[in-house]
Amino acid sequence: MTDQHPHVVVLGGGYAGTMAANRLQQNTNIDITLVNPREEFVHRLRLHQFAAGTGIATAEYAPMLGKRVRLVVDSAVRIDAPARMIRLESGDVLDYDYLIYAIGSTDSTAAGIPGLSEFAYPLSEFESAQRLRVALETSGPDVQITVVGAGLTGIEMASELADLGRNVRLVCGGQLAPTFGAPARRTIAQWFARRRVDVLENTSVTEVRPDSVVLADGTALSSAITVWAGGFGVPALAAHSGLSVDADGRLLTDDTLTSMDDGRIVGAGDAVTTTSLPTRMSCYTANTTGAAAADTVLSHLAGTEPAPFRLAYVGQCLSLGRGNAVLQFTRKDDSPVGAHARGRLTAWFKEFVLTGVPWGLRREGRKPGASVWFKSRPAQAAQHRAEVVQS
């Protein structure tokens, strides 16, 4: 580190990385570099709308990033932590004093499913959503579409298509909307039933073919277009770089989001997990960990002790087409309570949230340090740590 201009590199320009890079500007004496493989910001929460042809999922970085953030369009292929160096796909090398690891998540590998990579359309990245959009636009209006995935991504994709009058089937490996309470799940099921969407719960897809999907019992169902929303995985960059990861490949950090291996590496977003506080892959988690990761780096630079990351969840909201939505209220630990909201007002709230996410990132770029979030009490965080130790 130089005395005048420490260099902080942020890997990944999604919700977490963009938030972190902007927030770092609170220290006016550092150089900030954001590395992202695309020239545009991807609003991932709108990918299902983009794929269906009902929305836009990209935005220019220029108004999104603060003036002191330098964008490098490239991808990291290896982190050399002892040398504090990042090797990029282009062949270039970046030196850093601190690194924020925020590369996000990608499609679930779903190892062992024949035909998945060849014939299915994943819905976790812009490029795959773009291919799906072309397939939908060039297909007949009555072709059979199969969406695989019982979570929010699968439900929102299936409902967006059903709202357009498309012929949709939703295959759920377990129950529909497993993170929601029973009343909210019934609301979602009733919405699909009114639109004649065939929802197959506790049913696994074992093979994807060009014109069908094969279920675990051997049944082959016709499917001209198969959309895969069966979960998310993370890139193997941390593991390949010799850093400690969990069973899913997520970078392991302590409760300040600092890597268990290297105090110069701090994590944020989907590709990271703490040893003390379990978090859900989500935009909300990404934004908050991005802000907290920046705060941790700023504390390190200032020579002060970073504060433990604390987060309280309040709910999960999913859209059902353009005119309806379901908001599942949760406890601070993200477990569902019995209450939920639905209807047009909830749909308006969902759209308000979707619009507010990029607005919040732009605001952080203009006013670094402005973002705040709901936090759990220290006692609750300590309880989470105790539960991890006991397990």
Model regions: which residues?
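C-terminal auxiliary extensions adjacent to catalytic cores
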Residues: 2, 322-391
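Conserved N-terminal Rossmann-fold NAD(P)-binding element of oxidoreductases
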Residues: 11-12, 101, 148-149
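Beta1-alpha1 glycine-rich phosphate/pyrophosphate-binding loop at the start
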Residues: 2-70, 156-182
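FAD-site-proximal beta/loop scaffold in flavoenzymes
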Residues: 117-141, 220-225, 229-288
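Glycine-rich, N-terminal phosphate-binding loop of Rossmann-like dinucleotide-binding domains
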Residues: 13, 103-104, 110, 217, ...
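A conserved FAD-binding loop/helix module that cradles the flavin
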Residues: 239, 247, 271-321
